[in-house]
C-alpha cells in the first residue's frame, strides 16, 4: 500500500475476467468468503498478483492464501470443487512463508486434465479481509498475467 492506502492487484492468470456473481459456485458468487474477481484461465500458471508472501498452501494444492505487502489477504482458488482432484493436476512452485514478487509463478496446473475430470477451471481471487477495503475491478474481457486487475483502497478506520 502507498501513502494513499491503495494497492493494485495484477491478474494472476492469462484468461477472461469474470465478476464473482457469475461464478458457478454459490459460496464465491455470494461473496461468502469475501469480495473479489475471477479469471477463467487459458494458460495453466497461477502467478503472484502483487509483491507479498505465501500464507497457507492447501494440501490438495488447488488453493493458497497470499498476503500482499500492505495488508490485503487473498485466497487464490484454482477451479471450482477441484479439491476433489486431490492435487493430481497441480504442481506447487513455492512454499509457505515464501516471499514472492508480482508475476512470480506459484502453481502450475493442467487445464485439460481439470476439464477432462469434469471441473470448471474458473479461478476466484478473493480478498479475504475485503471488509477493510473498497474494491474496484480494473479490467474486463481478456487479460494477460500481470495486467492491472483490481484496485484496493483501504477504508478509513471508524471512530
Predicted regions, residues:
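Contiguous, well-folded functional domains in the mature portion of proteins
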Residues: 1-159
